[in-house]
């Protein structure tokens, strides 16, 4: 078992850190606000007064942070105290350029960096079934693998630094586009009088089905838009994707439309609701909601 520092105890970080404790790892935890640290301490974690203090105790240092700015700031702090033999892994969704800067900062101190974004949401973190997309050196990946296995099920080394993040950005592009497409299709079905539960059962086993449909359509029906992944967070990811596509010369037609819809949703006060709340942008002009289908 390893000594693991975990920095960033949000909706993903807290259950991931809890899984590490359940697996028998020793966890040194830090978060900017105190309640998540206290909750983890009650489960057996050690409290750290700063990110640097947590990292100083870790053989493996994990971060799960909400914004590019927070990742940049934290890694500049961590690099100052990094030491040879440490492995740092960032589970945040950020730009490839930021991943490269983190790797360079740590390499100058003899430490190794893995970009290791995850997919599966808080439920996947709690169940230990996350997909972990890793970029970096094979030796560092193999050393960190037992740690990742505490919260991940599908764990892949995708290539060198940045490769894991590239795969995650492709995933997030599809998440954004699928969420918009499912919202549009579900509202059309409701306006045509189709029962949404029947739509889910039938299309869920047809070519039009997808993981995002299975995730979002039940939320359309229940009207539970409490955020697992918020509109604001996915808009952040789509903005990163937009910039990466522009710099790479890739036209982002569907992705651009999805980004505009998420931006509009934020402007309508939906920023902190779950991304499934995007459906409201179609329901209002259609004069119906997915849970109450009506024809005519």
Regions found by a protein language model. Give the residues of each.
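Active-site-proximal catalytic alpha-helix in oxidoreductases
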Residues: 127-135, 156, 160-192, 201-215, ...
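Hydrophobic residues within alpha-helices
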Residues: 16-17, 102, 147, 188
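Rossmann-fold dinucleotide-binding core
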Residues: 4, 94-176
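Residues in the short beta-alpha loop(s) of Rossmann-like NAD(P)-binding domains
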Residues: 33, 67, 137
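Rossmann-fold NAD(P) dinucleotide-binding segment
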Residues: 51-112
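Interdomain hinge/lid region at the active-site interface
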Residues: 161, 165, 209-275, 282
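NAD(P)+-binding Rossmann beta1-loop-alpha1 motif at the extreme N-terminus of oxidoreductases
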Residues: 1-63, 86, 92, 122, ...
């Amino acid at each position: 078992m390893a000594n693991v520092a975990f920095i960033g105890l949000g909706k993903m970080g807290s259950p991931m850190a809890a899984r590490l404790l359940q697996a028998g790892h020793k966890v040194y935890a830090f978060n900017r606000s105190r309640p998540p640290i206290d909750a983890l301490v009650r489960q057996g974690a050690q409290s750290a007064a700063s990110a640097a203090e947590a990292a100083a105790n870790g053989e493996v240092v994990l971060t799960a942070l909400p914004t590019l700015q927070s990742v940049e700031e934290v890694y500049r702090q961590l690099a100052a105290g990094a030491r040879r033999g440490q492995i740092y892994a960032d589970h945040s969704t950020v730009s490839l350029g930021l991943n490269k800067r983190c790797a360079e900062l740590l390499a100058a101190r003899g430490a190794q960096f893995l970009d290791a974004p995850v997919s599966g949401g808080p439920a996947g973190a709690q169940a230990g079934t996350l997909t972990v997309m890793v970029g970096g050196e094979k030796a560092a990946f193999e050393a960190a693998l037992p740690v990742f296995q505490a919260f991940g099920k599908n764990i892949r080394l995708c290539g060198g630094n940045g490769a894991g993040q590239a795969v995650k950005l492709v995933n997030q592009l599809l998440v954004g586009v699928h969420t918009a497409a499912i919202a549009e299709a579900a509202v059309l079905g409701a306006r045509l009088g189709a029962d949404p539960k029947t739509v889910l059962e039938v299309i869920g086993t047809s070519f039009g089905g997808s993981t995002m449909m299975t995730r979002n359509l039940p939320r359309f029906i229940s009207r539970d838009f409490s955020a697992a992944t918020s509109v604001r967070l996915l808009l952040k990811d789509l903005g990163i994707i937009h910039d990466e596509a522009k710099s790479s010369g890739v036209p982002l037609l569907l992705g651009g439309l999805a980004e505009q819809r998420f931006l509009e949703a934020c402007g309508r006060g939906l920023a902190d609701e779950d991304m499934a709340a995007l459906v409201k942008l179609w329901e209002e002009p259609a004069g119906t909601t997915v849970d109450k289908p009506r024809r005519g």
